[in-house]
């Protein structure tokens, strides 16, 4: 039993030993595993710390590199700025050096000029001394005149140069402004224009009327031409006769006379004279109406009735083929437009423009230029001096006193210079016929003179009580000789002196 206890105790000890050993081995194995885990964890943490340290090191290197680059850029920028400042200072020093050299040069020049001035002063002092010695024997007035003459000679050249420069500048500016004003005026006024002709036609009811117009042995046509001073041309043109005359007024009166005769049907010398007087009255009325219409178109009010009538007469006057009344209206409107543009008196400019050729209404009846005659008429009918000056100055016979007078002259030139406004050849022809009549009228005892047949014949009507047959022949000869001396004309010119004595009695 004891052995069993011993064996059991030994077995228990062995089992305890085995169990303890097993537990120890388990603990050792667990400790090894824990140690391995700790080692692995430590290695892992060490790797992570290493990686983190590497990353942080790289970031630090990158940061340090960026800081270095920034610092390097800053330093480079500072160096560039320093270089620029140095360059600027160098340029400044260079300019200062150049300025200094210029100043030195100027000082040298001033020094030279000063020396020259000093020499001039010394010379002037010498001249003044000599002049004073000479002036000692002069009066105060003589000395004053001498000093003024020297001053004039000294500054005359400078004044002339300054005057020339200012004149050129003013003329240039004035030309620009004038072109602008003229263009504005021309744009505002663009009239229709129809050239004037020297013939009129009268329609007939039939060709039989031509024979009645001619009359027995041509007495009717001779009477008509003698009374009207117009050529009556009868040709093969059916149912038409032509009136030819350079004077539009005579031609218009003749046209109305002939139309009345044709309408009446009774054509003989006495009837011709009667119709001629009626036609004159109609034309007088038309002249007045034309004058009133002209003042309305031009915007001119308050003219004397006689001036209005004279304006109407301009309807039957031409200048180089241009109707004088239309020309006057055109000048008035152009002058008014330009005056408005320049801020001047447009009413005054229009008035002067409308009246500038008023003398042409009567210049065939009076001696003198149309401007002189026009000025006298304007003065007679109460126009102011500035308007009279516009009439006289538009052809340069008198200096313009107002800016409006200059505008009237400019408008006159504009109207005449318009393309197609005037015809030189027609005007020369008309002037030759007018001169022909003037030569004949210049002789004593001549009542009327008519140039007919396109200027190839002139008929002169004389006072029958004072001119006998012998004197009539002498008068025809004298007129022909004066025409030869004063006038150029093609071919042969016929001078016919008509002396007609009428005795009238009435049976009651």
UniProtKB/Swiss-Prot annotation:
GO molecular function, one term: RNA endonuclease activity
Membrane-topology annotation of the record: Single-pass membrane protein
Keywords: Cell membrane, Endonuclease, Hydrolase, Membrane, Nuclease, RNA-binding, Transmembrane, Transmembrane helix
Ranges where the HD domain occurs: 324-417
EC number: 3.1.-.-
UniProt domain KH: residue ranges: 198-283
Cellular compartment(s): Cell membrane
Pfam families, per database record: HD (PF01966), KH_1 (PF00013), RNase_Y_N (PF12072)
Protein name: Ribonuclease Y
Native source organism of the sequence: Thermotoga maritima (strain ATCC 43589 / DSM 3109 / JCM 10099 / NBRC 100826 / MSB8)
Keyword RNA-binding included in the entry's annotation: yes
This protein's GO CC annotations: plasma membrane
